[in-house]
Swiss-Prot record:
Gene3D superfamilies xrefs: 3.30.420.40
Gene Ontology molecular-function annotations: ATP binding; metal ion binding; pantothenate kinase activity
Cofactor stoichiometry and binding remark: A monovalent cation. Ammonium or potassium.
Keyword Nucleotide-binding on entry: yes
Record's keyword terms, sorted: ATP-binding, Coenzyme A biosynthesis, Cytoplasm, Kinase, Metal-binding, Nucleotide-binding, Potassium, Transferase
One GO cellular component, as annotated: cytoplasm
GO BP term (any one): coenzyme A biosynthetic process
EC number: 2.7.1.33
Assembly and interaction partners: Homodimer.
Pathway field: Cofactor biosynthesis; coenzyme A biosynthesis; CoA from (R)-pantothenate: step 1/5
Cofactor requirement: NH4(+); K(+)
Protein name: Type III pantothenate kinase
Similarity remark: Belongs to the type III pantothenate kinase family.
Gene behind the chain: coaX
Amino acid sequence: MNKPLLSELIIDIGNTSIAFALFKDNQVNLFIKMKTNLMLRYDEVYSFFEENFDFNVNKVFISSVVPILNETFKNVIFSFFKIKPLFIGFDLNYDLTFNPYKSDKFLLGSDVFANLVAAIENYSFENVLVVDLGTACTIFAVSRQDGILGGIINSGPLINFNSLLDNAYLIKKFPISTPNNLLERTTSGSVNSGLFYQYKYLIEGVYRDIKQMYKKKFNLIITGGNADLILSLIEIEFIFNIHLTVEGVRILGNSIDFKFVN
């Protein structure tokens, strides 16, 4: 029996997890993850592909913030699909509907870059604040008219939680969850409250400040593997899109100017 055709495989290699998205008819048909391991071997990745990807693809686009794994994935993909994957980056040339850089290009993680591109290309917004809550918490602003405005990078909730456990002798590990109240009466409840309300106030504070700074309306888009823990706390209208990064990687891969690719 022939394998079903899914034309594009998008891979987002992050610090905590590696996301795989298969696109069919411009929709995410399959979305799965594996844990990031800096020691991942060729045979481990190949076995993962055998178990999960009984599909044909004709394009593979990758965003990676863990370059030590790039060669392994490149080799596995070529062996498995007979395709050379394209690694997207902020410093390549793309044919987009807007110019991300109105001045000199500056160093930007490929995942952040993909988020910002998707926020403009996939939505009819003029100005967007994009929050990605994963290993790190990134909050970046982008404008259709002025390009990427900049942003802030903070540690994500799990890093903050583990740092507290490592440095506070009397606080023992417990499951983290969205707090019921701002002010809690137990240690675990208070830690949960502090852990997640800080992101609520960070996101809402940055959102209000940039609106005042630029005197413009900004739409808010939230993504990231840990975002679900804070969504119920946010009191500003927002869009949640768990696929924002892979959508951006796909847009970039399909709009690249191959004259500038080695």
